[in-house]
């Protein structure tokens, strides 16, 4: 199982990348990573809890229609620690909000690939697969085929 430190390192590596991946609608089962997140010292869980308390969103919710999962927020706050959940939620500039969404979704896909490639044996891949929409399943199949 990934440790808090390895997740922290993974996030730092991913945040430095500027990739051109397609952005599938991937629903990560956040509970699978909660234990590794709480093992870190970078405050990711605190940020996630702040968002949960602010927006009352399910930890297993899927990103669509500009709704972020807590994992999206955790990654975004990792890169921008000074930004608060309230400022993001109150942002009425749809173009700016969408632009941020695209950046964070690319990071989420990178993180998803990292776990699939490095910790596949610890994840319930069938459960992950069942949480994807049809487009996500097609794109995940391509990812797995090209591993």
UniProtKB/Swiss-Prot annotation:
Keywords: ANK repeat, Cleavage on pair of basic residues, Exocytosis, Membrane, Neurotoxin, Presynaptic neurotoxin, Repeat, Secreted, Target cell membrane, Target membrane, Toxin, Transmembrane. Expressed by the venom gland. ANK repeats lie at residues 57-59, 66-78, 79-96, 98-125. SUPFAM superfamilies: Ankyrin repeat. One of its GO terms (molecular function) is toxin activity. It comes from the Eukaryota. GO terms for biological process: exocytosis; viral RNA genome replication. It is found in: Secreted; Target cell membrane. InterPro entries: Ankyrin_rpt-contain_sf, RNA-dir_pol_PSvirus. Its main location: secreted. GO terms for cellular component: extracellular region; host cell presynaptic membrane; membrane; other organism cell membrane. Iso and Leu residues are assigned by comparison with orthologs. Two helices (H2 and H8) are predicted to insert into membranes and form pores by assembling into tetramers. The helices are contained within a helical bundle domain that undergoes significant conformational changes during pore formation to allow exposure of the transmembrane helices and transition of the toxin from a soluble monomer to a transmembrane tetramer. Insecticidal presynaptic neurotoxin that induces massive neurotransmitter release at insect (but not vertebrate) neuromuscular junctions. Native toxin forms cation-permeable pores (with high permeability to calcium) in lipid membranes locust muscle membrane and artificial lipid bilayers. May bind to insect neurexin-1 homolog, insect adhesion G protein-coupled receptor L1 homolog, and insect receptor-type tyrosine-protein phosphatase S homolog, and induces neurotransmitter exocytosis both by forming tetrameric pores in membranes and signaling via G protein-coupled receptor. Homotetramer in membrane. Belongs to the cationic peptide 01 (latrotoxin) family. 04 (delta-latroinsectotoxin) subfamily. This is Delta-latroinsectotoxin-Lhe1a.
